[in-house]
Each structure stands twice: as C-alpha cells, then as structure tokens.
Amino acid sequence: MTRIALALALVASLFTLPVQAQNAAALTAALASAEGRPAADKEADARRKPAETLDFFGIGPGMTVVDLIASGGYYTEVLANAVGPNGKVYMQNAPSALTGERGTRTEQAINDRLAGGRLANVERLNRDPHDLGLPDGSLDAAVIALEYHELYRNADPQTEARFLAEMKRVLKSGGVLGVIDHAGNAGNDNGPMHRAELDKVLAGAAAAGFIVDGTSDLLRNPADDRSLTVFDASIRGVTDQFIVKLRKP
C-alpha cells in the first residue's frame, strides 16, 4: 500500500467510526421516544443494545428485511425504525407458534404492537422459516434473535440446513443473516437450556455456503457460566450472548 493510500485509509477510518456511532445513537433516541412502543421494550434496550447490534449488521434506511421467529415483535419494531418509511420489515412467525395458550398471548402482543397501523412498514408473514414464500433475492437482511437454538430443538436433523438454504434463496447477493443467541458450552446438552454453541452455528453456516463476516462481543457476559437454562432467575435477560454476521456471497 502506498503512503497516499494508507493515509486515505486512515482518514476514512476516522470518519467511519463516528458515523456508525451517530447512526446507533440516532436509532437509540428514536426507539426511546417511539410513541406506543411498549415500556418493557424500552427498558430492555439498555441490556439488549439493539441499535448497536443492527449497526454491526449494517442494517439501515431503505432496506427490506425479515425478523425471523419474531414472536411479539421486539426486534420487528427496532427494524421498522432502522429501515425507515422507505424500507420494509416482514414479521415472520410460524402458524404453529400462534396457536394454543402461548400462541394466543403472542397474537395479542402482535396485535397490540401493530394496532392503528403504527408500524406502517411492517407486514406479517405467518409462514415457517424454511418456507417464507418470498421472491428469490428479495431481502437485504434477515435477523434471528435469541431463537437460532430452536433449529436444533427439532426431531428433523435437517432443520438447520433447510433454514439456511431458504436464507440463501431469499437474500440478495451480499445480503446479511444476523444471528443473536444465548451462548452454550461445547459438550453440554444446550437444547433444554435454550442455548446454542457458537462454533456449531459457524460450522453450519459455512457448510451452507455463507461467509462469516464477523462476530461481536457486544452482548457477552462472563458472569454467565452457561450451565443454567436461560430462564433461570439469576441470569434471565443477562445471559452470555454471541452475535454473528453471516453474508451470502
């Protein structure tokens, strides 16, 4: 690298980091002041760091994205604010997740969140995550938050492979699959604890043809030794979590 090129690269880095920080700060402020956003969501932001997480994934205005296994839609609303009025968010939940007592609660939470058309750029997608029914190459990004481990809690050993194949189909070239999950230890039976092993996620992604574009320690918590279920009162909400940015070639 020539001296001029090196100097330009250094200057660019000086501008890039503040801009990223500004983007995250702006989204944080927007989420805090969002009218009608649940108070519990706003309280959770400090520990979940959604603005910084989406900044790491590179998700921004005008993008078309999907919130996978969205449940009541915490990240759906975060994404809706991040992509803005010129973007679009699909809120995906499997039909089976919207039945029974728990499903009824989820459905009510969704209806409350979307009431009055307050998230006009959000469209519900009640389909299985391995069969989204969206056009090929139609998404800029997909986010699966604290749910990737569910791909392993399934009798079908091909569940993860089918999911990743669908992600490759619907993402544009260069599109991002962002994964956030509770970290598990190698050798543990992580399924019952609702955890996932980072190396296992990375191996599955590589086998499916994704590029690992980076990992983040933003949500790491060394005080969690990963031996307890994520619902244990001593660590609920503050588990050790990994963040992975996967990219479709």
PLM-predicted stretches and their roles:
Residues 101-131:
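S-adenosyl-L-methionine
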Residues 174-183:
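Conserved beta-strand signature within the Rossmann-like core of class I S-adenosyl-L-methionine
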Residues 63, 132-143:
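A short acidic, Gly/Pro-enriched loop at the edge of an enzyme's catalytic core
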